[in-house]
Every structure is written in structure tokens, then in C-alpha cells.
Amino acid sequence: MDVQFKKMQGTGNDFIVVKYDDFPFEEKLSQLAEKICDRHFGIGADGLLIVNPSSIADIRMDYYNSDGSIAAMCGNGIRCFSKFVFDEGFLRTKQFSVETLDGIKEIAIIEEKGTVKSVEVNMGQVTYDTEKIPVVSEDGYFINKKITVGGQDFIITAVSMGVPHVIIFTEKLDLEQIKFFGPLIEKHAIFPKKTNVNFVHRIDKDNIAVRTWERGAGYTLACGTGSTSAVAVANKLGLVNNNVNVEVEGGNIKIKIKESGNLFMEGPAENICSGRFFFN
């Protein structure tokens, strides 16, 4: 069957967007994600976004990693999703709510000259609760603790931003090392559901650089929940202020920490192409 899709990207993190009405086979969505996201035999993307109606919010987003696994939340993905539903006329207002497996997220569309310039998302707060992340620990938190993988020690902090994240501060962002150690940390025994891995370089109080190895997707050019988690941890440790620019390989993301403690992420969302994918 032919599946109508749109391909989008947010700071280099790319996604395929499909309306559920165009593929109403929930039991086959994981298989669709694997096939359509394949960069050699499919369209190619980091993940699949499904547009669904919601009974508790204005609309619902379901997200599948490129390996077919389900993720509760995707920061760059929800920006692309929000631009899609706004541009396609699903919602007429610039502020709306999106249901995710990580709860309801509040969205603000930012336009310039009649086109969507960027999207702001209320990401909520990170949790350090080891049971909710989850991570195996004798304490109720996992902050600045040592683990050893591949013969090398790392000081890590584990949090959840709807999905599990590890934050590692480093003086140098070495892509070769990130791609080697990333999957080893992702699958470390202390993470029963695996984890995303973020290598973070602090530039100054207002700027950091983040490189992410994503659970279920591998190395990506950006990770919204990872960037948000990195700022939250850096702020908690006194390394950055409340308004931080995050440099990722695919561009820049702005993270603001409000008085409530909620983290707001703002970044671009752009169309790449649209078409029909033959699925069998």
C-alpha cells in the first residue's frame, strides 16, 4: 500500500510524519518505522511521528524510533509535529496542547512573515528519581557517579525527560569516542530500559555544546530532550544560567528555565519533502 508522508527536520534531527488516517494499522507502526526510516532502503529518518486525535489534549503525537521502538517523548520531533499540524490546518491557534506518552505538552508557534520560524515547547521538569528514569542505584538519585565502560571511567548524571538520559561533561567533544562509548553506555546493565547518552561541553554560563547518542536511533545531529536535560543538570550543578543556548551539530536550540522550574525549549522546524512510500 502507498503511505502518504512528509519528511521534516529540526536542527538536523529528521523525521517522517504520517497521519494515522493514512495508515490506520497500529499493530504495524513499528514495522513501518523500521522500513520508512531506513536510510538505504527507505526514505531515511531518525524517527516516525504519527498524528492522532486526542480526548485529553488538542491533538496526540505518537513517536517511534528508527529501530521501531516506541519512545514517550521526542523534543525535536514535537517541534516538527507541531509545525505540521499547524500548517496542515489541524489546529487554527498558535498555542495548543499535544498529548504524548510523557503527558501533555504546551506548544507556542512563533511565526515570521506568515511562516513558522520556530516552535516553543513547555518540556516540564526533569526527574532525578532513579525508579522513574530508570537506573539501578543504591540511592534515590544518580548524580556525578562513576561508571566504567570499555576500560574508561565516566562521571555521569542520570535523569529522565520523559525518556532516560545520561549527562557527561567533557572538555572535548570527540565524535569517534562518542560513537564508540555511546552505545556501550546506552546498553549498560544499570539501565534496564537502556538510555540516551549526552556528551556536554560547557562553553560559558550562557552556552553549551551537546552531542547525543540516542537510544534506538544511534548518533543524531540533535536531541531536544537531551539538550533540555543537559541544561537542567548543568544549571543544578551551578554551571550555567537560566537562559542557555545549546549548540548541536545541526544548529542551535534555546532552553529557558522559568521560575516554576519548567524548562522551555525553542528551536526550528522545517519541511524537507513529501510523497508516498510503498509499504508491503
From Swiss-Prot:
Keywords of this entry: Amino-acid biosynthesis, Cytoplasm, Isomerase, Lysine biosynthesis
Highest taxon of the lineage: Bacteria
Pathway named in the protein's UniProt entry: Amino-acid biosynthesis; L-lysine biosynthesis via DAP pathway; DL-2,6-diaminopimelate from LL-2,6-diaminopimelate: step 1/1
One of the Pfam families matching this protein, by short name: DAP_epimerase
InterPro entries xrefs: DAP_epimerase_AS, DAP_epimerase_DapF
Residues in coiled coil: none
Site feature (Could be important to modulate the pK values of the two catalytic cysteine residues) residues: 165, 214
This enzyme's EC code(s): 5.1.1.7
Family membership: Belongs to the diaminopimelate epimerase family.
Protein name (database record): Diaminopimelate epimerase
